[in-house]
């Protein structure tokens, strides 16, 4: 469930596969889910390269993953692959956090991975001109501050002090944004594409939940009947 919720918001993804073990059952599941929720681009990282002595084995794993990607509609032949070891890179950075590119082969492989992401996954065009809208993904309370809701802003721009509506499931209510945070940094504004935490004035945790949306007042109307296309997953 968490993988689907997160993947549905992605502009691209890094598929991590063990170079030592090859594709696992969850590898197939993640590729399928990525396709079904509309992840447009994937870059593959073959992890644990330090455990593979045979270059042919590494090539075989890459071939397997490319075929698997092709089976689910991704361009397997064109997707970038980067091999490395996240553990070895982390160990070296932990020992020397000022390490620069070109000074360690394992750290360089992570740089190469991010190069592949930058080159293969295009920077998306954000819809910042339209009115603010964000689906609620999670809600939690911060002692002494209030209720925070998290999610990905679908469109528009939001600022501290703005008035918004909480729409869906219950009576529509109005509140004021008293704080914005992203990746533990306080912001003055958030915009389309940001995964953000929004601190709401006078709202209790019990009053808001996943399935509701935050929106500019008067722009979203809740409905009890609608048409939808549903993809059902079994356990």
Curated annotation (Swiss-Prot):
Record-listed GTP binding positions: 47-50
Enzyme class: hydrolase
Pfam families: GTP_EFTU (PF00009), GTP_EFTU_D2 (PF03144)
Alphabetized GO MF terms: GTP binding; GTPase activity; translation elongation factor activity
tr-type G domain ranges (all copies): 1-125
SUPFAM superfamilies, A to Z: P-loop containing nucleoside triphosphate hydrolases, Translation proteins
EC number(s) reported in the record: 3.6.5.3
Catalytic activity: GTP + H2O = GDP + phosphate + H(+)
Gene Ontology cellular-component annotations: chloroplast; cytosol
Subcellular locations according to the entry: Plastid, Chloroplast
Keyword GTP-binding: yes
Alphabetized UniProt keyword annotations: Chloroplast, Elongation factor, GTP-binding, Hydrolase, Nucleotide-binding, Plastid, Protein biosynthesis
Function: GTP hydrolase that promotes the GTP-dependent binding of aminoacyl-tRNA to the A-site of ribosomes during protein biosynthesis.
Family membership noted in the UniProt record: Belongs to the TRAFAC class translation factor GTPase superfamily. Classic translation factor GTPase family. EF-Tu/EF-1A subfamily.
Protein name stated in the entry: Elongation factor Tu, chloroplastic
Species the sequence originates in: Gracilariopsis lemaneiformis (Red alga)
